[in-house]
Curated annotation (Swiss-Prot):
PANTHER family: RIBOSOME MATURATION FACTOR RIMM (PTHR33692:SF1). Binds ribosomal protein uS19. Belongs to the RimM family. Residues 100-182 form the PRC barrel domain. NCBIfam families: 16S_RimM. Gene3D superfamilies: PRC-barrel domain (2.30.30.240), RimM (2.40.30.60). It is found in: Cytoplasm. Disulfide bonds: none annotated. This is Ribosome maturation factor RimM. GO terms for molecular function: ribosome binding. The PRC barrel domain binds ribosomal protein uS19. GO terms for biological process: ribosomal small subunit biogenesis; rRNA processing. The gene is rimM.
Length: 186
């Protein structure tokens, strides 16, 4: 598997931890077993040119920080661990957990086009998903939506059924019913 489309990013190495080669990983996954269950994972270099197989020995969650501390069999000391800063931890996309109806993988939502359900107007494109009390879709607004320069404007849209009633992965679109003023808050 060397195609970037065949991988799922589960986290990014942000630092070495301790002297025995442990790594701090900022999670981009909602599935703790990806960091806690031993087995094969893959590392992608920051330049995205190389992917190497590694063996996860153990991992533990650091409460309140969205971080895991992991140990890879191939990394013996802090010096080796420090060379992996900004590497990405991957799993094959075939390892995606099955989701219930109404649940989505974040990677499936990125780059979907967002439309106003009542007017049909194209609003923008999903650029990220942020976790807060509710998940929030980060949407880059279209420049065509107003006379203002909105080329860099982004809005956060609560990812709840009342506001986002339609997610159509097949047609790569999301329809929203934003409350008055939501799109002007950026």
């Amino acid at each position: 598997m060397d195609n970037s489309e065949s991988w799922l990013e589960i986290g990014r190495i942000v630092a070495a931890q301790g002297l025995k080669g442990e790594l701090k990983v900022m999670s981009s996954s909602d599935f703790p077993e990806r960091f806690e269950k031993p087995g094969t994972r893959w590392l992608q270099s920051p330049d995205r040119l190389s992917i190497q197989e590694v063996e996860l020995v153990r991992g533990r969650y650091v409460p309140g920080k969205n971080l895991y501390v992991i140990k890879l069999a191939e990394i013996a000391d802090r010096t080796q661990a420090e060379t992996l800063r900004d590497y990405t931890l991957l799993v094959p996309s075939s390892d995606r957990p099955q989701l219930n109806e109404g649940e989505y993988h974040v990677s499936d939502l990125i780059n979907l086009t967002v439309y106003h359900q009542q007017t049909g107007e194209e609003i923008g494109v999903v650029t990220d998903m942020l976790s807060a009390g509710n998940d929030l879709l980060e949407v880059q607004l279209n420049t065509l939506n107003s006379s203002e320069n909105t080329s860099s404007k982004k809005v956060l849209i609560p990812f709840v059924y009342e506001i986002v009633p339609v997610v159509d992965l097949v047609n790569k679109r999301i329809e929203i019913n934003p409350p008055v003023g939501l799109l002007e808050l950026s």
